[in-house]
Amino acid sequence: MKYKAHDYQQYATDFIIEHPVSCLILDMGLGKTVITLTALWLLLFDYFEVRRILVIAPKRVAETTWPAEIKKWEHLYGMTFAVAMGTAGQRKEALLSGADVTIIGRDNVSWMTKNIFFDFDMVVIDELSSFKSPKAQRFKDLKKVRPMAKRVVGLTGTPGNLMDLWAEIGILDMGQRLGRYIGGYRDRFFLPDKRNREIVFSYKPREGAEEKIYELISDISISMKAVDYLDMPECISNRVTVSMSESEQALYDRMADEMILEYGEGQDIDAVNAAALSNKLQQMANGAAYDESGNVRNIHDRKLDALEDLIESANGKPLLVAYWFKHDRERILKRFPARNINTKKDIEDWNEGKIPVALIHPASAGHGLNLQEGGSTIVWFSLTWSLELYQQLNARLYRQGQKHMVIIEHLVTDGTVDEDILRAIEKKDTTQNAMIEAVKARIGGMTDDGRSNDEGI
């Protein structure tokens, strides 16, 4: 795919190239990965500034996002990569492979520093919040080898806690800007907040502390304020692809082929026609499905895992999560401290920024529902065939009065009906006929009532 950079993306890429130490403090969904990869390619093959690059990321991001982005963009052709995941032997093989870019999960940083000679002249830390605790072992171990890299890039969203910035910036510049000790940073920029006599439970920033902190790190960082003056798009639509395991995909494919999954009497998952099959396949793509008795059968947690990554990347910035099936909502609520948007009080709390993760059903997001003050990011956990409901929900945030760029994230399970739905939405063809035709195309030869066109002998 050809990459056409927005102004802010080109600005950020140039910033990385021009600054040996750099930090991109940009909201989730703005393309920090491709921004960084573009800079890495240029530093490797145009400027010959670096020869081996280490990318540290959360496990699932390391396994899927970075490799997928490298393979996705045409302008990154020629860049080799290795993913240091799996067994100790597999990780070691990847780290010693000599690839241009080696990607490792943050949980393996300590293992790497103890078992492999550190031979990287550039480090990229995707999600700096992974290193917000100076007491964490991964922070201490990376700090030891950090001076061996002549270039470093940190990627993060807008911080929800200024106290965390000390460690996050410190791992990049080795304490040059915010000081070498957390105590000095705390005394300089914070005051005790909640306390019990001599025991301080929390701190609050001093007046003007935020402006002063950002001023101190301004020479190495790009924040949302720094790119505000550029020609920023009003809305960005992203696809977050997840993949099922072979066994999970086999269940999905069997349902598509046979229209039934047998679990025992009263527990089967079945479909009687193309429309019902599309519904069941969509449920399975989301991770669970109702059996014939109305009970929920879990298939996988791939979208929940991806949502967890998005929540972490948001750094406390509110997310509005759209779901379609009741079991989607229940599974999300079981895993995350989310809250439904149902009542007037829910709407008020959302608009006041009191709900970090809010759940909403597209059918309940009618015209006149104002949610734009509470956030600017929508995550479609479940997609919908209804173009009207899709546009209607997006318009709850992407509307007059919205002060920030709107990010729309779509969770799409690879090789499933999710891809058909998103394609139909993009083409604005989400009729009942389009849904049935999509199912027919996937499984071949089905009529509307579920019978096969292939009558046989």
Question: Residue spans of the language-model regions?
Answer:
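Conserved Helicase C-terminal RecA-like lobe
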Residues: 1, 18-21, 30-31, 35-45, ...
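Conserved pre-motif I regulatory segment
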Residues: 1-25
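Conserved Walker A/P-loop ATP-binding site and its immediately adjacent core
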Residues: 35, 50-72, 160-164, 325
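Conserved helix-turn-beta segment of the N-terminal RecA-like "Helicase ATP-binding" lobe
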Residues: 61-86, 172-175
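Conserved helix/coil segment N-terminal to the catalytic DExD/H
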Residues: 88-120
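Conserved RecA-like P-loop NTPase helicase motor core
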Residues: 105, 329, 337-424, 428
